[in-house]
Amino acid sequence: MYPKDTDIRVLIGCAPCQPFSSYSHKYQNNENTLKKKDLLDYFGKQIELVKPDIVSMENVPQMQSREVFHRFQDILEKNGYKVTYKVVYAPDYGVPQKRKRLLLLASKFGDISLLGPEFSPDNYPTLRDTIGNLPEIRAGETYVQDPLHRSRNLSALNLKRIRQSKPGGTWRDWDKDLLLEAYKKESGKSFGSVYGRLEWDKPANTITTQFPGIGNGRFGHPEQDRALSLREGALLQTFPLNYEFVDPKQGRNYPISQVALQIGNAVPPKLGEIIGKSIINHLEELDEF
């Protein structure tokens, strides 16, 4: 797996978060999701087989209370690793979305820790900082110079709904004839962010694989009558502006859901960068002794 001349062997894994996420609670008992629960155990077996010097893992905060996570810790500790884990708030590390993630680091060389936050509430990156300069597009339109700056079309009814939605508001801002039946019930209170618009001067809500649809969360553009474009979702995940998720030869001929799956399932590159810098810092500290 590693070249023979490798000095330090690092293994990084991220089991699918759906079995542990509160967002996907309704899917947690379907067959595909149940199979994914075993993947952290599989990662533990690979660690025992490969014997890397350093291990890292990322997932949703809910995982830390699950038995599979405790088994994973036990495997690491029994194999001589010093383990540390922490729930981080993504804006603290330059990710412009209200995302909390569980980050784990483990080393055979000794104690290892995650680098401290780089941002604070007074300078968190905001939605405006991240997507404010992108060209305006309509629902269902693709910007001619960037095939990824593409927004899903809206039905006439959903267009009326988003036009009555306010940044940071809820479906309670709508006229009664626009309400879904579910929202008229007491249980409808739990749908507060659905069909909502984001706010310019705050970090965005967590980007999921469903962000191109306004009915899936607070994914409405603050001003334009549409959901976030694929490019906007990618930028909020901290991918570079020129990052390509599809073969350029495809142009605009690709399913929006296919690309949204890649974007929403990704570890934000800036969080990945922090993990990498933390590992480098750990190794540099070892060299000083």
Segment roles from a protein language model:
Residues 1-8, 18-194:
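Class I S-adenosyl-L-methionine
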Residues 11-12:
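Hydrophobic beta-strand segment of the Class I
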Residues 153-289:
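C-terminal target-recognition/interaction regions appended to catalytic cores
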